[in-house]
């Protein structure tokens, strides 16, 4: 599948702080691609570089085949991509109706049908000044302004921040519908349950480096907890095998997390005369925590 977003060895330094360290991203066209990481992991710096808001220290990146560090290309990218920032900055002196009308004037592919549906669904008060909106209402308005542009690519930074559970579910379903209409979604989040619900591709970043890049189905199929019980004491070294992300031994019990080769690992345990071997699924949250621990 072709990539809408690609980066090669992308780096961003702020003085001596290396915020992004050699990032190689590939966001498949037509996907809902989640960008997971702790606060300070490099997500926002990456998004800023992709959108031409910050220049890379080194490395390259392309969106729609256009260079992210070229001023003319960056303008073309922003004509075809919508960005909803985490801080949801809006013109506070305008009313809801005024900012919608103002934003609509810049985008020839504006979807008036979606605008009307979201106004009703989000219950946004057209005559209210933006400065008088609650945090949740501001988030809904910012999402409406991004979603209705009719863009090929939507880049969303913490899109559900400040929303209640009902509104979150509404937003997630809208994201799915936009992809069905042909858009690509690239969104950063630390809300892992939401990611697990809708994403079909997941990227994890830790301390500026990519630690996972895989289709969600593959992650769910391949990652497993394995626990084996042996008749005698065993060593962790006996299970330093391909595909083992982490292993711990406590007397006769070995517990490990595997990212692949689970059948081979189970066979190895049986060859070592394991009394029992249990294989269990692992959640995306647990995988994320494993990646963070491994990076410390």
What function would you assign to each model-found segment?
Residues 151-159, 233-235, 263-266:
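Short, surface-exposed beta-strand/loop "edge" segments at domain boundaries and coil↔beta transitions
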Residues 102, 117, 218, 267-268:
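Generic structural signal for isolated residues within well-ordered alpha-helices
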Residues 257-296:
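C-terminal coupling/interaction segments
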Residues 11, 97, 192, 233, ...:
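Alpha-helix N-cap/helix-start and coil->helix boundary motif
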Residues 158, 230, 281:
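Residues that line or immediately flank small-molecule/substrate-binding pockets and catalytic motifs
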Residues 170-260:
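ABC transporter nucleotide-binding domain
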Residues 22, 223, 244, 274-276:
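A broad structural signal for short, well-ordered beta-strand segments within beta-sheet-rich domains
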Residues 2-7, 12-206, 211-212:
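ABC transporter nucleotide-binding domains
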